[in-house]
């Protein structure tokens, strides 16, 4: 009976751990929504947290990729953003909270969103692969 209990316990534990591992959503890229902001698209855009720390920019993307494709794509609405091949599948959508930098060319996101992106980036390659789209006004 102990052996049966141990096997059942082990099986339940494995299923539980597998379930938690698969419950983390896998994102295929990032969409930053700047539709309501006075944002100026730029080839050298930076995404910053509320403390001014860079979350994404040219330093995160290989020079070869950036030269061929740019570090972001710009679109006019969420439907275009989600359909963009750069992030297609299951992109994470983040709302930009303000603009900053010369000519309003950089976006600021909440510290919570920045933390989430940094956490995801530890396990996914969407930042260094330039899988980023920005929705512009």
Language-model region placement:
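Domain-level marker for long, solvent-exposed, non-transmembrane regions
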Residues: 1, 20-137
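Bacterial N-terminal signal peptides
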Residues: 7-16, 20
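Positively charged n-region of N-terminal signal peptides that target proteins for export
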Residues: 1-7
């Amino acid at each position: 009976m102990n052996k049966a209990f141990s096997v059942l316990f082990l099986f339940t534990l494995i299923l539980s751990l597998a379930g938690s591992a698969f419950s983390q959503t896998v994102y295929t890229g990032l969409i930053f929504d700047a539709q309501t902001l006075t944002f100026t698209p730029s080839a050298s855009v930076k995404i910053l947290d509320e403390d001014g720390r860079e979350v994404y920019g040219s330093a995160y993307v290989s020079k070869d990729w950036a030269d061929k494709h740019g570090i972001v794509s710009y679109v006019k609405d969420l439907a275009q953003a989600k359909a963009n091949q750069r992030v297609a599948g299951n992109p994470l959508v983040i709302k930009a909270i303000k603009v900053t930098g010369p000519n309003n060319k950089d976006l600021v996101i909440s510290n919570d969103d920045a933390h989430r992106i940094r956490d995801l980036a530890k396990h996914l390659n969407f930042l260094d692969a330039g899988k980023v789209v920005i929705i512009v006004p």
